[in-house]
Amino acid sequence: MAPRQKKPNKSDDDDGDLHRKKQSFFKQRFPGFKKKASELSVLCGNSVGFICYGPDNDLHVWPQSQDHNPQALHEIVAKFNALSDERRKNHACDLNDFPHHLKGLSREELRKHLLHLDSQLLGVREQKIEILKKTLTGSSEKDGARVSENSAISDHKLKIEPNLTDILSEDHLIRVSDKKLGSCDVFDELAYVVRGSRNLNENVSNYESKDAAYTGMDHLGTFGGNYLQEAAAELYQTYNLGNFCDDHVWDLEFASRLPPLHTFSDPLMTTNTCQTMSSDMISI
């Protein structure tokens, strides 16, 4: 049996490949280190620099003068070294000792530390109370303005309601409501206007001077109670409607039996010049 041949040792080749991988990885990540350092400098408003070694133990520093940075790394280090020890301690803190800063303190020191914490809490509480007061004051002012507006509206209503009550309690409304609808006196009080007149305050009596144009209507006479009495009597005799007596009071519950308006021969009862009651003529 032939002896087994030894395979070539590839450890040297593997080390070379690993070294090349590290170099390529460092080249890819180093620009990201510089970007993060510049962002930290901008956010904190302080000068930032770092020193690192590459895969070949070569030194890399940032920032450098060729990086268009206002301060190079050696300038930052010189500025830091120029600070006194007291100034450095003011801005230095050992994070490892921070949880144990109460250890080794005497009773008096602990009492002072607690008083300091209480004073800090009291200051925070006072600030919170001031903020709440300002908030409540602003809301109360808005509520006061709303209440004053509502009170003004209520006062205005109180001023209007007595006048409205006086108007609704006029004697002539009661007098008109007590009379029957068919009374001639009621028609005289309500007054009528001729449709088509420009002024609603003009009643039929204003058109008495124009009767000369109606030569065939001499039997109408003067518009008013007499005309309405004659019209009521004529309706009573023609259609036998309601009850008509000597005091000229008649019942108007015949609306369903009346013919349409356009069938009347009376020119004042046609659709063009029909007499219409005007609510504006009622003295309210």
From Swiss-Prot:
Chief place where the protein resides: nucleus
Molecular function via GO: cis-regulatory region sequence-specific DNA binding; DNA-binding transcription factor activity; DNA-binding transcription factor activity, RNA polymerase II-specific; protein dimerization activity
Disordered as annotated region, ranges: 1-20
Keywords: DNA-binding, Nucleus, Transcription, Transcription regulation
Described function: Probable transcription factor that may function in the maintenance of the proper function of the central cell in pollen tube attraction.
InterPro entries on file: SRF-like_MADS-box, TF_MADSbox, TF_MADSbox_sf
Domain (MADS-box) ranges: 21-66
UniProt gene name: AGL49
Pfam families, per the entry: SRF-TF (PF00319)
Any single GO BP term: positive regulation of transcription by RNA polymerase II
Keyword Secreted part of the UniProt annotation: no
Keyword Phosphoprotein recorded: no
Complex and partners: Interacts with MEE14/CBP1.
The protein's name: Agamous-like MADS-box protein AGL49
Origin superkingdom: Eukaryota
CDD domains per UniProt: MADS_SRF_like (cd00266)
GO-annotated cellular components: nucleus
Subcellular location: Nucleus
